[in-house]
Structures are given as C-alpha cells and as structure tokens.
Design a protein with these regions (language model features):
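Short Gly/Thr-rich strand-loop-strand
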Residues: 90-132
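C-terminal motif of bacterial Sec signal peptides marking the signal peptidase cleavage site
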Residues: 14-18
C-alpha cells in the first residue's frame, strides 16, 4: 500500500508539472524607474539632458511611436546617452531595437570617420541595446559595470 501511495503521488506531481504551460514573457523595464537608477548609478561621465518626447522617434529612427519613453543625451557633444522605450507589443519592440542598433551603428561610423570625441568610441562599441518584453533599452556610458548592476539587478518591472 505504501508503494502505491508513493507511485500515485509521483504520477500526480508529473501530471501537474506537465500542466505548467509556457514560461512567462520577460519583464520589461519601467522607463522612469530604470532611467533614474541608471542616472544615479555613476555610469555616466558626461552631463545628460532629457530629450523632448516628441523628438524621440525621429532621433532614434523609430517607425512607431513608443507608448512611453525616456531619452537622455549628452550636453557636451559626446555620445553618452540612455533610452528606455515602451512599445505597443513585442513585435514593435523588436522593430525599435533594430532601429536603435542602426542608430548606434551610425554614430559609431560617424565618430570613426570624424574623430570628434575619440574617447567616446569605446563607449559606442560597447553600447548596451536590450529588448525585454515590449521594452527596449539603450545605454552608451562610461561604466558598463554600473549599467549591468542596474539592468540585471532588479530594476525591471
């Protein structure tokens, strides 16, 4: 009888585990919370200023308007910046990620040719571009350890 109880319990556990379904979608980043944490992390050497919301799509080359966005750019003519975008869905976020990657590539190519701020070239080459759910994050900074601590340390929703 004891063996039968153990066997039935094991079968019930296997059946319940099979009903688990798909893993949840990755949580996105909250633009306000994440941008504040990044700005306070010490990751940036240059003074940053928030970009007007109506300029975000044109600045980053986005096809679709984000539902929410926080974008900061360098006031010093440098390339340090951060952007956290909330898009309508994961497909729109994937398209936004592609546009953001193209934005970083264009800036890298420009700096390689012009050498206006050569000290920023390594920052551009190490830029962080991530998609989490329906959000996209871009960070061009001086301290990527600080960036990683924020993005990997629980600032996601």
């Amino acid at each position: 009888m004891k063996k039968l109880t153990v066997l039935l319990t094991a079968l019930a556990l296997v059946a319940l585990a099979a009903c688990g379904g798909k893993a949840p979608a990755p949580a996105g980043y909250d633009p306000e919370t994440t941008s504040k944490a990044l700005l306070e992390s010490g990751a940036f050497e240059q003074e940053l200023s928030q970009l007007d919301a109506d300029m975000v799509s044109a600045y980053l080359g986005l096809e679709d308007e984000p539902e929410a966005a926080v974008v900061y750019t360098s006031l010093e003519g440098g390339y340090e910046e951060l952007a956290i975008l909330t898009m309508a869905d994961e497909d729109a976020a994937a398209a936004a990620k592609t546009a953001v990657e193209a934005h970083v590539t264009a800036q890298t190519e420009t700096e390689t040719e012009v050498q206006y701020k050569p000290e920023d070239l390594p920052k551009l080459k190490d830029a962080v571009v991530r998609q989490a759910g329906n959000t996209v994050v871009l960070v061009v900074a001086a301290d990527y350890d600080a960036v990683g601590a924020v993005l990997d340390g629980g600032s996601a929703e």
